[in-house]
Amino acid sequence: MSQNKLKTLIEELKKRKVFNNITSEEKVDLITLDHGIYVGFDPTAISLHLGNYIQMVNLKRFQNVGFKTIAILGGATSMIGDPSFKDSERKLLSNETILENKKHIRKQLENFGFKVIDNLDFYKDMNILDYLRSVGKFFNVSTMMSRDSVANRIQSGLSFTEFSYQTLQAYDFKVLCEKENVMMQLGGSDQWGNLVSGLDFINKTLSKNLPTIGITMNLLVDSNGNKIGKSTGGASLWIDKTLTSPYVLYQYLLNTNDDDAYNLLLQLTFLQLSEIERIKNEHLKNPKLRLMQSRLSFEVVKDIHGKEEAQRALHISTSLFKEKNSWFNLSLEDLIQLKGSVDFVPFKDDLFLTLVDSKIISSKREFNEFVRDKSLKINGQDVTGLDYDLPWENYDNKYLILKKGKKQYWVIYK
């Protein structure tokens, strides 16, 4: 029964366009629900981002069918840096930075329901001689150099520190295999070489007869093959809502094209495949309604931040772009979420100076034209002239919402 569950899940992952490769189809039949699966997350930043999130979703799918799931927090491996398909060596992080990053990322992983283990615990009592004898002895340098993940870096320069990364990832797999009965490692398509190294290490040090397998998943990319996870301004889309507000994430997904929206519904949501096809068919009847994008945005924000934040993001979006004169429905908390999505500009001595200084308008003539055409609004009300009485009281005497034309927005603050 459990074998069928794994096979069925792999077939679903293929239909969801996330499955990339597996090291052994035959061993799938040997895996049971008593076996665990893990994914590693190196705390190289203060938060995980949307590109990491797809691996969290993939791991959650295994958990949902009954497998034990573990997220490895790379307290040790983040001190080195994975060279896989990187153009240059990462700058080494300080211990203080790694500790701070670990604290935040652990909470994100635990909130998603995973057991979190810090791999620093595997190495903190191991000295260099222990490592060379119990780990290094089992790795062939020529084989390590032939891995695609590092081969491209050999000519441009690869430090021994980075070169040894795959040995630590392999040792992680062995420890989890022994102590947690983990037989499966999940990783992005760029992790194939590291996964194979782990399997080879287990074969040499434990047994060749264990049902250990590595499964790689496609990276999060758009229909043009570009990595997804950056906002239009180039900043990462973080899982931490203090770095990327739920509304900004919502808007990013809402603005995807139809092909990307469909693929992301498959890859990032837990909706049934039949439901996704139903949404797609409804969408195609009237693409201007952007039903796929709307459902995608809501589902992802809900799964990351909770239903309340998803409803808030929907409310803000509806107030800004759909419902006429609904600015007054936005709360102060809603307004703060707009940071990162619309420009916040400082208030000068008066409204006209503020607009000129922020390059929103260029002259009094242009200002008067917008006023005449009723194309300048503050908090949903028409600006009537240079002496317009600004309604600061609407937002705690701190913010004004400016709209120019049909779709240009700013928040003025003081």
Swiss-Prot record:
Q: Which UniProt keywords apply?
A: Aminoacyl-tRNA synthetase, ATP-binding, Cytoplasm, Ligase, Nucleotide-binding, Protein biosynthesis, RNA-binding
In the UniProt record, which is one GO cellular component term?
cytosol
Q: Would the keyword Transmembrane be found if you checked this record's keyword annotation?
A: no
Q: Where is this motif: 'HIGH' region?
A: 43-52
Signal peptide residue numbers:
none
Molecular-function GO terms, alphabetical: ATP binding; RNA binding; tyrosine-tRNA ligase activity
Binding annotation for ATP: 230
Q: What's the catalysed reaction?
A: tRNA(Tyr) + L-tyrosine + ATP = L-tyrosyl-tRNA(Tyr) + AMP + diphosphate + H(+)
The S4 RNA-binding domain is annotated at: 349-413
A biological-process GO annotation: tyrosyl-tRNA aminoacylation
- What class does this enzyme belong to in the EC scheme? ligase
Q: Where in the cell is it found?
A: Cytoplasm
The main location is cytoplasm
EC number(s) on record?
A: 6.1.1.1
Q: Tell me the residue numbers annotated for binding L-tyrosine.
A: 38, 165, 169
Span of the annotated motif 'KMSKS' region: 227-231
Report the CDD domains cross-referenced here: TyrRS_core
Would the keyword ATP-binding be found if you checked this record's keyword annotation? yes
Q: How does it assemble?
A: Homodimer.
Q: Which NCBIfam families match?
A: tyrS
Fetch the HAMAP family from UniProt.
Tyr_tRNA_synth_type1 (MF_02006)
Main role? Catalyzes the attachment of tyrosine to tRNA(Tyr) in a two-step reaction: tyrosine is first activated by ATP to form Tyr-AMP and then transferred to the acceptor end of tRNA(Tyr).
UniProt record similarity statement: Belongs to the class-I aminoacyl-tRNA synthetase family. TyrS type 1 subfamily.
| Matching PANTHER family | TYROSINE--TRNA LIGASE, MITOCHONDRIAL, TYROSYL-TRNA SYNTHETASE
Record's protein name: Tyrosine--tRNA ligase
- Organism of provenance: Mycoplasmopsis pulmonis (strain UAB CTIP) (Mycoplasma pulmonis)
Q: Recall the taxonomic lineage recorded for the source organism.
A: Bacteria, Bacillati, Mycoplasmatota, Mycoplasmoidales, Metamycoplasmataceae
